Amino acid sequence: MASIPATVATVAQANMVAPFTGLKSNAAFPVTKKVNDFSTLPSNGGRVQCMKVWPPLGKKRYETLSYLPNLTEVQLAKEVDYLLRNKWVPCLEFELEHGFVYRENARSPGYYDGRYWTMWKLPMFGCTDSAQVMKELQECKKEYPQAWIRIIGFDNVRQVQCISFIASKPDGF
């Protein structure tokens, strides 16, 4: 039989909690006084002259980067490389009639038609090279030359679409 040392607490040890002494004085905390001096506020006043306003009439906005001129093959490949570096799954979608959101079936605020496009094949799980995506883009263009085609980056961990941009537009758009 092994002997186990016994621990016995005395009454004095059981009541060893420090007494409450009240709240501390505010004088112990440092105080910074704010000065109403507007000379240090940030300003872009010097740059306003060189800014331009996007004309809202007659210009369709599609996706990210849609306000830029059409991207070249090299620029598209760089965007796809960015997508792959972030471990997003590339996916191609196309639309034959409307490459932009529009209202046809409902007039309620916040509802738009044209947000869901047809997927080109399957998402490219395991894709590691932008050349693979560019090859699929060329196939989609060959099959549907008058379609809007966009490239999407899908995060399969968070299950969200992280990037989407137009890769090809029909002639005249």
From Swiss-Prot:
Residues 1-49 form a transit peptide. One of its GO terms (cellular component) is chloroplast. This is Ribulose bisphosphate carboxylase small subunit, chloroplastic 5. Heterohexadecamer of 8 large and 8 small subunits. One of its GO terms (biological process) is reductive pentose-phosphate cycle. RuBisCO catalyzes two reactions: the carboxylation of D-ribulose 1,5-bisphosphate, the primary event in carbon dioxide fixation, as well as the oxidative fragmentation of the pentose substrate. Both reactions occur simultaneously and in competition at the same active site. Although the small subunit is not catalytic it is essential for maximal activity. GO terms for molecular function: ribulose-bisphosphate carboxylase activity. Keywords: Calvin cycle, Carbon dioxide fixation, Chloroplast, Photorespiration, Photosynthesis, Plastid, Transit peptide. Belongs to the RuBisCO small chain family. The basic functional RuBisCO is composed of a large chain homodimer in a 'head-to-tail' conformation. In form I RuBisCO this homodimer is arranged in a barrel-like tetramer with the small subunits forming a tetrameric 'cap' on each end of the 'barrel'. It is found in: Plastid, Chloroplast. The keyword DNA damage does not apply. InterPro entries: RuBisCO_ssu, RuBisCO_ssu_dom, RuBisCO_ssu_N, RuBisCO_ssu_sf. Its main location: plastid.
